[in-house]
Curated annotation (Swiss-Prot):
Optimum temperature is 70 degrees Celsius. CDD domains: HAD_PSP (cd07500). The lineage of its organism: Archaea, Methanobacteriati, Methanobacteriota, Methanomada group, Methanococci. This is Phosphoserine phosphatase. One of its GO terms (molecular function) is magnesium ion binding.
Length: 211
């Protein structure tokens, strides 16, 4: 019998990878503390995601692209990520990542882990430097939920056969749409909306709960 096709959508920063991409880039720009403070408020749901992202990216203005690339080299997949994705694919899952962060980091991990889809925002670069602007389809509050629906539609998968894995407030919209909602080392605001909360920082833990 053919396996039923299902979909799993991962958040990127602090879920599929150990880092917060923007915090790593901010370290290169010497504005790490300011940016971290805004990231924390956004993940706790105290700030609108798009406003907070634009505010953080504006602090990166004039950073050379080489410094961005240096920061991205520090981004590492979460413990167990490679095994987990391999096993999910064996179980018939389409595996996707969606990030309010940046394609320059997300696409590297997509290739490394062999993901089927990756959605992220873009840092605008001019003359080899960041302009302090950002564009993309993961800026709005409900963007992740819309992307989950979009992939499910393309792949012909029912929403009840979808899983969302995330850690912060901007993952709420995909939790609202997904059949199974897994909070991974998450903030309290997301745990409230989850079916399952995992506290151990090892992605293999999710396999216990996924058919």
């Amino acid at each position: 019998m053919e396996k039923k096709k299902k979909l799993i959508l991962f958040d990127f920063d602090s879920t599929l990878v150990n880092n917060e991409t923007i915090d790593e880039i901010a370290r290169e720009a010497g504005v790490e503390e300011e940016v971290k403070k805004i990231t924390k408020e956004a993940m706790e749901g105290k700030l609108n995601f798009e406003q907070s992202l634009r505010k953080r990216v504006s602090l990166l203005k004039d950073l050379p692209i080489e410094k961005v690339e240096k920061a991205i080299k520090r981004i590492t997949p979460t413990e167990g990520a490679e095994e987990t994705i391999k096993e999910l694919k064996n179980r018939g899952y389409v595996v996707a990542v969606v990030s309010g962060g940046f394609d320059i980091a997300v696409n590297k991990i997509k290739e490394k882990l062999g993901l089927d889809y990756a959605f992220a925002n873009r840092l605008i670069v001019k003359d080899g430097k960041l302009t302090g602007d950002v564009e993309g389809e993961v800026l709005k509050e409900n963007a992740k939920g819309e992307i989950l629906e979009k992939i499910a539609k393309i792949e012909g998968i029912n929403l009840e056969d979808t899983v969302a894995v995330g850690d912060g407030a901007n993952d709420i919209s995909m939790f609202k749409k997904a059949g199974l909602k897994i909070a991974f080392c998450a903030k309290p605001i997301l745990k409230e909306k989850a079916d399952i909360c995992i506290e151990k920082r090892d992605l293999r833990e999710i396999l216990k709960y996924i058919k």
